[in-house]
C-alpha cells in the first residue's frame, strides 16, 4: 500500500513549498486547503517536479471542526507517513479593530483544527511503522 504525507494549508506559501519539497524526494502527497483550484495547480506543478509522486487533492475548510472530523474519517482509507499541520492565518493590526467572527475562525483553524488533527494522527499512528 502506498504511504502518503498529508500537508494542510498546501494551496500557497509554506504549505505549497513543503509539498513541493517532499515531491522532490519522491513522496506521495495528500494536499489539503480551502481553495480547490490552487490545489489542482499545485498538483500540476508537482507532476512536473516528480511525475511518479501520487498527489491527492482534498479541498476542506479546516476552520469548521465538523469538516476536520469528516476529513480524518476520509483519510483513514490511506496509509499516512506524516502529517504536516500547516494550515493557518493571521489577522494583524490593532486588537480593538479586529472582526470578532474572523478572530473566532482564526482560532478555530489555528488552534482547534491543529489540536484535533494532531491528536487523531498520534492516536491512530503511535503504534504504526510510518517509514
Predicted regions and their residues:
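Active-site loop of short-chain dehydrogenase/reductase
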Residues: 3, 79-80, 125-131
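Conserved glycine-rich cofactor-binding loop
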Residues: 11-13
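Conserved glycine-rich Rossmann-like NAD(P)H-binding loop of the short-chain dehydrogenase/reductase
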Residues: 25-42
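The beta1-alpha1 cofactor-binding region of Rossmann-like NAD(H)/NADP(H)-dependent oxidoreductases
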Residues: 59-70, 100
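Hydrophobic positions on the long internal alpha-helix
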Residues: 84, 117-121
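Conserved NAD(P)H cofactor-binding loop of Rossmann-fold oxidoreductase domains
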Residues: 86-91
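Substrate-binding pocket helix/loop in short-chain dehydrogenase/reductase
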Residues: 94-95, 99-107
Amino acid at each position: 500500500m502506498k504511504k502518503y504525507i498529508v500537508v494542510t494549508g498546501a494551496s500557497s506559501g509554506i504549505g505549497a513549498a513543503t509539498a513541493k519539497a517532499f515531491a522532490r524526494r519522491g513522496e506521495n502527497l495528500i494536499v489539503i486547503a480551502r481553495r480547490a483550484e490552487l490545489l489542482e495547480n499545485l498538483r500540476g506543478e508537482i507532476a512536473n517536479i516528480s511525475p511518479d509522486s501520487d498527489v491527492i487533492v482534498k479541498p476542506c475548510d479546516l476552520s469548521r471542526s465538523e469538516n476536520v472530523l469528516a476529513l480524518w474519517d476520509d483519510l483513514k482509507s490511506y496509509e499516512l507517513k506524516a502529517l504536516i499541520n500547516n494550515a493557518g492565518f493571521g489577522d494583524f493590526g490593532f486588537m480593538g479593530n479586529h472582526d470578532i467572527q474572523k478572530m473566532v475562525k482564526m482560532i478555530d483553524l489555528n488552534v482547534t483544527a491543529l489540536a484535533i488533527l494532531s491528536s487523531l494522527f498520534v492516536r491512530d499512528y503511535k503504534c504504526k511503522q510510518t517509514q
